[in-house]
UniProtKB/Swiss-Prot annotation:
SUPFAM superfamilies: Class II aaRS ABD-related, Class II aaRS and biotin synthetases. Homodimer. Its EC number is 6.1.1.21. This is Histidine--tRNA ligase. One of its GO terms (biological process) is histidyl-tRNA aminoacylation. Gene3D superfamilies: Anticodon-binding domain, Bira Bifunctional Protein, Domain 2. It comes from Clostridium botulinum (strain 657 / Type Ba4). Pfam families: HGTP_anticodon, tRNA-synt_His.
Length: 415
């Protein structure tokens, strides 16, 4: 029996990797335009980080984390989300002592034990932006504008931005009391998980995926009616900034997000009923993890879900030829010259491929065509004697005679 990848994981094969490289390069360039620099954090962290950051009553912590003890008996968890590790690194690195704001981005694998389905894997990859140190609603709008630009540049249409405010701990306390009063009428119909959330964190019930609970919360009190004056002013400012940036949005009063660290602004980008990007403000997480009281905002974008969206919308990612020149050979002497020539060209950043299989010239040209080489050139006894060879443009068959010893002129063909 042949071994297979674990359930809920997917190999990224060379035939698909160009799509990821294209997106990653685009995202890096866009992040740089906003002044963000890259951060990389470990693939596993101490479990306490996610218990304190994400929240013990969340589905992520209760049901979805890959947690184990290491040989020293320490509880370790594979990273289920990207924000808490970024905050931990920010605090541990004492970046809060630097001039603020601190802007960072990351690409990271994320592991959650979820039901495997379309667009949902147990290991997926996330692109994230985190901005620390700025409390104004203008930075929320700036963060939201990054996915907007990404979708515009990729040509993704039909993406809906939904926003909400879940207030601060002070006004959320008032809302939780109203929510519990409403939910108490249907307490017996709540799922077992939501019954445990009822006293500890009733807001989490709004995020439950069980049908009976979803039906119950349809007529629940709306949190926007309970937020304090400061949170209301922040939300109004956000809407004004989005209007100035010509970013369309809808207010969805039931967006709460599945992670406990959020406060004030929360948002989701949705297409075809699938959330492809989400985020919000988390003004209390840095302090919770051991740093100073400092505001922050960010988002996470699932790479696999984005690629699925591009596929469903028939948006093709351009594939650049990964071979500039296929160097064919006829005979052992020619192969030696091909090896030397390939080295010189590769040293000048010309992507070359040569034959290592002893194929016939016909088979070599067939292979060159299959791998999408831009040009091909074959060296044999005649080419070695004359020092001249013919480069063939694979796309249209155009031929150019070149001096195989004149590397500078040869390189100009590919530029």
């Amino acid at each position: 029996m042949s071994l297979q990848a674990p359930k809920g994981t997917k190999d990224l094969l060379p035939t698909e990797s160009y799509k990821w490289q294209y997106l990653e390069n685009k995202f890096r360039n866009i992040a740089a335009d906003f002044g963000c620099r890259e951060i990389r954090t470990p693939v596993f962290e101490y479990t306490e980080l996610f218990q304190r950051g994400v929240g013990e009553t969340t589905d992520v912590v209760q049901k979805e984390m890959y947690t184990f003890e290491d040989k020293a008996g320490r509880s370790i968890t594979l990273k289920p989300e990207g924000t808490s590790p970024a905050v931990r690194a920010f605090v541990e690195g004492r970046l809060f002592n630097e001039t603020q704001p601190t802007k960072m981005y990351y690409f990271t694998p994320v592991m959650r034990y979820e039901n495997v389905q379309k667009g949902r894997l147990r290991q997926h990859h996330q692109f994230g932006i985190e901005i620390f140190g700025a409390k104004e609603a203008s930075v929320d709008a700036e963060v939201i504008s990054i996915p907007v630009r990404i979708y515009k540049e990729l040509g993704v249409e039909g993406v809906e931005l939904n926003i909400n405010s879940i207030g601060c701990p002070k006004c959320r306390k008032t809302y939780n009391e109203a929510l519990k009063k409403y939910l108490s009428k249907n307490y017996d119909k709540l799922c077992s998980t939501c019954k445990t959330r009822f006293d500890k964190n009733p807001l989490r019930i709004l995020d439950c995926k069980v049908d009976t609970c979803k039906e119950i919360v349809k007529d629940a009190p709306i949190i926007l009616d309970y937020i304090c004056g400061e949170c209301k002013e922040h939300f109004e400012s956000l809407k004004n900034y989005l209007d100035v940036l010509n970013i369309n949005y809808k207010i969805d009063p039931f967006i709460v997000r599945g992670l406990d660290y959020y406060s004030k602004t929360v948002f989701e980008f949705i297409t075809d009923d699938i959330t492809i990007c989400a985020g919000g403000r988390y003004d209390y997480l840095i302090e919770e993890i051991g740093g100073p009281s400092m505001p922050a905002v960010g988002f996470g974008m699932g790479m696999e879900r984005l690629l699925l969206t591009l596929q469903e919308k028939a948006i093709e990612i351009p594939e650049e030829a990964y071979v500039d020149l296929y160097l064919g050979n006829m005979g052992d002497k020619a192969k030696l010259e091909v090896l030397k020539l390939a080295k010189e060209l590769r040293d000048r950043h010309i992507k070359c491929e040569i034959d290592h299989m002893g194929k016939s010239v016909k088979a070599q040209m067939k292979y060159a065509n299959r791998i999408g080489a831009k040009y091909s050139m074959v060296l044999g006894e005649e080419e070695l004697n004359t020092g001249k060879a013919t480069i063939k443009k694979m796309e249209d068959g155009q031929q150019i005679e070149v001096d195989i010893k004149d590397i500078d002129t040869l390189i100009k063909v590919f530029k």
